[in-house]
Amino acid sequence: MKDRSPKLRDDAGGRRMKYMLLVYLDEQAMSDEERAHCYAESAQLTQNLNATGQYLAASPLHPVSTATSVRVREGKRLVTDGPFAETREQLGGYYLIDAGDLDEAIRIAEKVPPAKFGTVEIRPVMEIDGLPRMESNGLPRN
């Protein structure tokens, strides 16, 4: 069976993996000042990850009030305003990183500013045959 794990090769020939860091937080729990400080810290983290070659992509998301959910059941599309689940913490952003292993991904996740008051979920990224693959520099592979 072909290895389908989300791995990249580094310059030393070692295996690298892509991880998605999903940032969950309670949007209402942050003041405007705390949010601005969080964005500044996140920008610094992104610059640091970029300098070490671990940054692939990152972005905050607009508030959950702007979300639209789409479901298809029995061939019929249902579009609703808002998120699928009603929970206190909502998906607020993400980082896509290149890490040597889960331990390295955890060390990066603990530096994500919203981890101080929210949750950062770490998920390995799976590559599927037939889909374009991303190089470690964040660009699609030709």
Regions inferred by a protein language model and the residue ranges of each:
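Conserved, structured core segments of small domains
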Residues: 8-142
